[in-house]
Amino acid sequence: MSVKHFLNTQDWSRPELDALLDQARAFKQSKLGDQLKGKAVALVFFNPSMRTRTSFELGTFQLGGHAVVLQPGKDAWPIEFDLGTVMDGDTEEHIAEVAKVLARYADILAVRAFPKFVDWQVDRQDRVLQAFAKYSPVPVINMETITHPCQELAHILALQEHFGTTDLRGKKYVLTWTYHPKIGRAHV
């Protein structure tokens, strides 16, 4: 059986996404549950986060699980992503090992890794997230790389609640966000 990762919404069917939204609605009603009882979630942050980290840590706890936060290069060894690289520089671990080792400890891996915003041809490969998915035998959740599928679902749920319907066809809205200096300077 293949592992079902949540890397982007395009990999999931409409009925699967609708089922996730239905489950999110149910979670909002009850606040606490045991769906993750006895489960561990490894949250791997290559970039800072406030809302996403808080949401995932508290969400894991509220569903009965335990989250561990790792920040490669800060409180965990830096990770190498290129195959065949001699590991004599800044990186101490290779993704092929890291993903498998973390999967022995955790039931789910969640990854946040922004692209470099230098070369779109490189960034669009989403190498960090794709490497975790390639080597992990447990599900990988994208906490934001070049896409933010969990935030996409949160937006859809908010719009459905605002409009009072799950059918958003023909509904008009404005989506805006705060300027991010790193992304704002990108040539993508």
What are these regions (language model features)?
Residues 46-66, 160-187:
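Glycine-rich phosphate/diphosphate-binding loop of Rossmann-like nucleotide-binding domains
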Residues 1-54, 58:
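Positively charged, low-complexity intrinsically disordered leader regions
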Residues 25-29, 156-164:
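Generic structural signal for well-ordered alpha-helical scaffold segments
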Residues 36-42, 50-160:
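Phosphate/diphosphate ligand-binding glycine-rich loop within oxidoreductases
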Residues 8-11, 71, 167:
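Short, solvent-exposed coil/turn linker segments
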Residues 9, 45-46, 121, 143-144, ...:
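Glycine- and other small-residue-rich loops at beta-strand/loop junctions that grip anionic moieties
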